[in-house]
């Protein structure tokens, strides 16, 4: 999980801090994973460094307060597009719920007879609305995202 903070005197920036907390299916679990925030931040930074010559990104600096060093990034403050991007290789969670009622996930028709945990014929992109805290994200089709 990540939390956002606006640094004093930097209305143009946001400090993104990754925690060791776990969330699944829009719920925060009681347990944590030691150093998860550090690992997530290192992975994110690794990818942002690799794509820097290909596409602009929001990372400004890793020069952050000592209390969050290694698990925070100073980033450009941007307007968020409220979409969660999910790539699925297996049928589970909200995708399974959609499939059981419609035979598809996010408008993508899937073969009949799939079960919880079934491997999909190929990975699929299944966007969801990014709900406010306490509410559940809702799966949507790509046309909804394009609007």
Residue ranges and their predicted role:
Residues 1-132:
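Active-site loop/lid in soluble adenylation, ligation, and acyl-transfer enzymes
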Residues 144-147:
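A mid-sequence, solvent-exposed acidic-amphipathic segment
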